[in-house]
Amino acid sequence: SRAGVIASLEPIINTLKNESKKGKPIFGICTGAQILVESGLVPGTSDDQTSVALADNKRIKSGEVVGTGYYNAWSNLKLSVPQNSTAFTRHLSENEMINIPFAHAEGRFIIPDDLLEEMKTNDQTVFRYCDYNGKVSSEFPTNPNGSDYNLAAISNASGCLLYTSPSPRDNRV
């Protein structure tokens, strides 16, 4: 079964849903992101159904899969929405890049094309993997897990929920 499925059925999820409706910020990292995805809180479709998946990593270079599963490295992320779109990015600059640890096996965002287009329109595609110059590329190592649209973090439409597969909590700086 997918990571986060069982936890997404726990009673605490109803509390998180109620608090998010009040606009309270909720930040899901790694397994927390998987729980938010499985609960339907993010991206927050009207029926709270699971509409996004976090799948096994696939490192792809020149159209070939060069690795799968667990990967650990530092990643560059680029803010790809206006900074006031979420409670978590309001102090960042437009197109700001951050460098954070990446350490997981199941963080590859898979999103249906129609939902991805809706999320882009709603400024929910918050951070995308990029290289040191800010260029977004689907090639490994820039995109370390093969995520659709190079996504590293997405939010709900109101911006109070953010989830990310890279793990800023692992930053020892």
Model-flagged regions — what are they?
Residues Q34-I35, R108, N171:
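General alpha-helical segment detector with a strong preference for membrane-spanning helices
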Residues Y163-P166, D170-V173:
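Single conserved hydrophobic/aromatic residue that forms the stacking wall/gate
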Residues Y71, K78-A157:
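Catalytic beta-strand/loop cores that center a nucleophilic Ser/Cys/Thr
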Residues S1-N84:
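Cysteine-nucleophile active-site neighborhood
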Residues S155-A157, L162-S165:
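Cell-surface, membrane-associated systems
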